Amino acid sequence: MFYRENGQFKTSYRADQQIFPIRQDRIVMLLLLAVAFIAVPALASDYFLRAILIPFLILALAAVGLNILVGYCGQISLGTGAFMAVGAYAAWNFGVRFPGMPLLAQILLGGCFATLVGVIFGIPSLRIRGLYLAVATLAAQFFVDWAFLRIPFFTNYSSSGNVSVPQLTAFGLPVQSALEKYLFVLILVVVFTLLAKNLVRGAIGRQWMAIRDMDVAAAVIGIRPMYAKLSAFAVSSFIVGVAGALWGYIHLGSWEPLAFDLARSFQLLFMVIIGGLGSILGSFFGAAFIVLVPVALTNIPHMLGMSLSVDTAAHVEHMVFGALIVFFLIAEPHGLARLWSIGKEKLRIWPFPH
C-alpha cells in the first residue's frame, strides 16, 4: 500500500534511467544517508564505530569490488585478500617514500597498483574458467603473501614485516578519532558505491553480464571477451585495493601480511554469496551479516547464561557460515538481496495476495 509507483510517470529517458526510479526508494535512501551522516555520529559510541561500523563499511566496499568480478562478470576469484594487501602496502610505501603525499592520493595509488596486479593475474581468465580460474587466482594469494614476507623492500626493511601508519590527515583535517575515521570511510564508500552502481548499469556492465551468461554468444554479437574480462578484473581490483588501503590505514593502523591471508579472501567470497551475486546492495547485506554474526555469537550465549570459549565461538562461527552458504546455494542462490526484492514485491500488492 505504501510502496507503489502509482501516479509516478516518467516524461524523459533520463528520469526513467535513474538509479532509484521509484520515489519511495529515493526517500528510503535519503533517510539512510541522513542516519549514517547525522544520527550515527551523534549517537554511536567509539567502540561501536571502531569495532562494527568501520569494519562493516570497508568490508562492504571490498565485497562490492569482488561482486563486480564474480557476480556481474562471472569470473570466480580466490585472490581478493591478495589484492587488498597490494592496495594496503602500495599506499603505505607511497606514504613512506614520498613524505607529504596526501592521504587520499596514497589510497588511490594503492588501488592503482592493485589494479595492475589484478589485471596480470586476470590474464588466465582469457583461456580458462570455473575452478581452473579459481586456482589461478589462488596462486595470486600465495604469491603476494610470499612477496610481502620475503622481499624486505615492500616493508621498508622492517625486521618483523610489521608496518605502521603515522598520524593521518586529509585535506588539512585530522583523521584520528573514531568519528573522524568513520566519516572519512563513509564518504569514500558512498562515492565508490555510486561509481560501481553506475558502471554495472552502463554499457560495460551489460558486457560483463553478457560474458557471465554466455561468453561465446557475447563474442558473436560483437563483445570482446578480452576487454570485458580484463576490465572487470581491473575495476574489481581497484575497488578492492582501495578497501585494502582503508583496512590497513583506518581500521588496523599497524599490520603484517597475515592480515590479508587466504581466510580474508574466503570471508569476502562468503559475503558475496550470502548477500547476493550480481547485486551491489547484496554486498552490503553480506558484509553486515559477516560482521554481525560473530557479535551475536559472542553475546547470545552470555544472555542465555552460557559460556563459550574463544575457540568454540570461532568454530561455531565457521559452522554457521558454512551452513548458511549451503542454504543460500540451494534455497536462494541470489542471497539476501533476492529476499529483499521479494519483500518489496509483496509490499507493492499488500494487502492483496496477488
Language-model-derived ranges and their functions:
Residues 1-354:
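Transmembrane alpha-helices and adjacent helix-loop boundaries
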